[in-house]
Amino acid sequence: MGYQEKKQIVLDELEKSLGAVKEEEVEQFVDMICDAQQVFVVGVGRVLLMLQAFAKRLNHLGIKANYVGAIDEPAITEHDVLVVGSGSGESVVPLEIMKIAKKYNAKIVHIGSNEHSSMKEYEDLFVRIPC
């Protein structure tokens, strides 16, 4: 299988996944980010790597973004948004971070695939990416 065939497989997968994401959830997510004073991201493993890249891109756009656990991480406030990436919605560390952020009245966005997870009671918005 050559490059073009492999490329098409990847593009088809992306189209299938992103085509199932609800536009109104993404629009609300964007609005929450734009309205926040700061954006924080948390996840585990590969999800965390992608969220760190996302935070970097937000900073390039002039939106102050941090990842939880960074040495220079500021405090979260009620004016901020926490973006949690967890497909299962059961990742222990992100779930505990959500609980803390909720105590500070931060807005919480959960990006994942399981809409009936333990994170449900803490999220203000769930953006489902089916897999």
Task: Give the predicted meaning of each segment.
Residues 41, 47-131:
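Glycine-rich phosphate-binding loops that contact phosphosugars or nucleotide phosphates
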